[in-house]
Regions:
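Class I S-adenosyl-L-methionine-dependent methyltransferase catalytic core
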Residues: 1-201
Length: 201
């Protein structure tokens, strides 16, 4: 496991922080099919989504609906960029920005758990998930992932560090979901697209 610590000024857009942006791009360069369910204005991944319709993302669905749509269409992603709201307050702010009513379930841990379950369903053995937040929970052993790299970015003052994790899937999850569409390893022919993600500034 590789562990690094760097310093950078904070930004409301995670990937505009230079060391974090480079962390993401280093994995995108190796990816054929990538997914970003919380993309905001970044069109770096093959498939991008953000709940806010005023962003540049390709889709504007609830993150769980977006991930389930990809699963149901047979999409296999060798890389998922998982940068959700980091706290219940941030979830509430995101929903309020688009005029959506915030429920207790939205601000409880179940949202994060459901998102991770859905991510695991589109990532094959050998696939990578990049997780961002204030802790190192990540996808975890529950979803059969191992940690490859941790980058801690200090922002100084009273700001929380941003913790960036790269994890690799080591096995399927058995009968939790019909994962027959994930029998190919990352690096095999990907479906439905072999497009390499184009990095937009």
């Amino acid at each position: 496991m590789l562990i690094n610590r760097k310093w950078a000024m904070p930004s409301s857009d995670t990937f505009d922080v230079p060391p974090i942006g480079e962390f993401v791009k280093s994995y995108l360069r190796q990816s054929k099919v990538s997914v970003d369910p919380f993309a905001r204005n970044k069109r770096w991944a093959t498939y991008t989504n953000d709940l806010n319709p005023d962003t540049a993302a390709e889709h504007h669905l609830d993150a769980l609906e977006f991930l389930e749509m990809l699963r149901d269409t047979g999409t296999i992603a060798d890389l998922v960029i998982f940068d959700p709201p980091y706290s219940a307050r941030q979830v509430a702010e995101c929903y309020q920005q688009v005029g959506r009513t915030v429920t207790m379930q939205d601000t409880q841990g179940k949202s994060w758990s459901d998102w991770k379950d859905a991510v695991a369903e589109i990532v094959p053995v050998g696939g990578i998930v990049l997780s961002f937040g204030w802790n190192t929970v990540g996808m975890g052993r529950k979803h059969n992932f191992e940690i490859l790299e941790i980058l801690m970015v200090c922002h100084g003052g009273v700001h929380n560090d941003t913790i960036c994790m790269a994890e690799r899937k080591t096995a399927l999850q058995g009968n939790m979901f019909n994962e027959t569409h994930l029998t190919k390893r990352a690096g095999d022919t990907a479906t439905p697209s072999d497009n390499v993600a184009v990095l937009h500034k």
